[in-house]
Amino acid sequence: MFKRHKSLASERRRELISRGATRSILKDDMKNFHFLSQFILSAGPLKSTSAVKHSKTIHFEIEILDAQTKKQICIVDKVTQKSTIHDVKQKFHKACPQWYPSRVGLQLERGGPFLKDNLTIQSVAASSIVTLYFTDLGQQVSWTTVFLAEYTGPLLIYLLFYLRIPYIYNMKESSRRLCHPVVHLACFCHCIHYIRYLLETLFVHKVSSGHTSLKNLLKSCAFYWGFTSWIAYYINHPRYTPPSFGYRQVAISAINFLICEAGNHFINVVLSHPSHTGNNACFPSPNYNPFTWMFFLVSCPNYTYEIGSWISFTIMTQTLPVGIFTLLMSIQMSLWAKKKHKIYLKKFSSYMHRKSAMIPFIL
């Protein structure tokens, strides 16, 4: 009897323990479910995973050799296909700091043309390894510096001769002889010409961001400054002889000079701005300004007006140095005009055959 009660008591105890364990498990499950639901709600709505696009980037290895000795200077690696020659020059400058980018000339072949900075590596590469030849271009200066030096020099040099500073002319002769009115007019026209050049260089022309060698700067300055000194010396000399036909010759040539200067300015304004279509490659077209109607006759009216200015200045002053300078400038500008005219013919052949390069119906 005692054993039976003992067994019943033990069974009763097991039943209570199992019920308590079940309740504790249920409580734990409820807590876990509540925590899981709160976590899902805080995570927000499920987003569909987008497919990851794997773009294969091609890298090039640029081997740079000396153009004279063919010795390897450096290797520029990890160059992408969209990188330009200018980017290669920048990396080359980091490897060789003594050569800054504007001084570096890169060629595909020895003696070949220098690669332009805007060319991409993909356009010149035949394989993943590209060999380029390096040439030191020497000391470089910007084109803006070249133009400012070319035009500032003649402006100041002419004024020095016009003021008849000492040690240029005989002081006694200079004080005795008065300047002819054409001398003052010539100084005015000469100053207007080069002041216009300077202002257009700073505010009108879209000067290239490229560079040129210091030798080219010295050559250009020697040409312009030297001829200006020669011209100014003769025109401002105390023994200067006025034009043969007097004031009528001076007045007509001066008016024509000012007309050509105005026309040159308006043409440069048209050339510096894109066309109404927004395409810089389009042939520049005339507008409502009568000075721009010269585009109907010639491809390069800016050279036409420039030569017209110097011919007028030659007639107005009637001096040999101005005539020689005008002749040389005419030859040079005719070569530039023919070259540009050929480019226009290739691009706009149906429209350009009826035009001349610089002089209407002649050249």
UniProtKB/Swiss-Prot annotation:
Keywords: Endoplasmic reticulum, Membrane, Oxidoreductase, Phosphoprotein, Transmembrane, Transmembrane helix. Its EC number is 1.3.1.-. GO terms for biological process: very long-chain fatty acid biosynthetic process. CDD domains: Ubl_TECRL. Gene3D superfamilies: Phosphatidylinositol 3-kinase Catalytic Subunit, Chain A, domain 1. It is an enzyme of class 1 (oxidoreductase). The modification Phosphoserine is found at residue 37. It is a multi-pass membrane protein. It holds the Pfam family Steroid_dh. It comes from the Eukaryota. One of its GO terms (cellular component) is membrane. It is found in: Membrane; Endoplasmic reticulum. GO terms for molecular function: oxidoreductase activity; oxidoreductase activity, acting on the CH-CH group of donors. The chain crosses the membrane at residues 143-163, 216-235, 250-270, 311-331. Belongs to the steroid 5-alpha reductase family. This is Trans-2,3-enoyl-CoA reductase-like. The gene is TECRL.
